[in-house]
Amino acid sequence: SAPVFADLDGDGDFDLLVGNHEGSIDYWENKGNSEIADFVYNPTQFIGVAGGRNSVPAVLDLNGDGRNDLLTGNLIGQLRKFVRIEQGNGFYFRLERRKYLNLDIGIGSVPKITDLNNDQQPDLIIGSDSGNIISFQPDPEKPGILSWKPSLEYFKQLNLPIGGNPEFVDLDTDGDLDLIVGSEEGTLY
């Protein structure tokens, strides 16, 4: 399972998405609030969303419309891009790119969205089962729809374990992000 919290329905609280081994994404809408969550399973928005085996979701507004879209990593090392489409009082996700960024990171892509360099812009970090981590940052030469360019300075010196699943948090409260990597064997680095 690959859980991620994000405000998908725009109501100001975090909903829960879980990618799974079969390739689907499960959605639990938070019917509570930001202080007391009440997660209710809601499959409607994700009918037809197939991220590929071992789906790992990441959420971000990719097309500049103010609504969160969806990236999914999968077993074969690719990313799929789904855009959010409004329909009546609800929404659904439509596949826009099967091989987003023409990327093949190797077995098991794990996308994460974070701001690595404190520039108030989202960076895309992708881990893989092979232990590789690559990163992309927004391309300032292409305003409007979010476009990425490789960011080569990060992670090139790291020798990571098989099944590298990166997570970023300020563990030591010094104002910058620290990297934690989960491995296939269950160890944290």
Annotate each predicted stretch with a short phrase:
Residues L16-N20, L70-N74, L124-S128, L179-S183:
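Hydrophobic beta-strand segments that make up the repeating blades of beta-propeller
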Residues D7-D13, K31, D61-R67, D115-N117, ...:
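Calcium-coordinating acidic loop motifs
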Residues E29-G52, V83-G106, Q137-I162:
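Blade-edge motifs of beta-propeller repeat domains
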Residues D174-L177, G182, G186-Y189:
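Short, intrinsically disordered, charge-balanced linker/junction segments flanking boundaries
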Residues S1-L8, N54-L62, S109-L116, G164-L171:
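Beta-propeller blade termini
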Residues G23-S24, G77-Q78, G131-N132, G186-T187:
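Loop/turn residues immediately N-terminal
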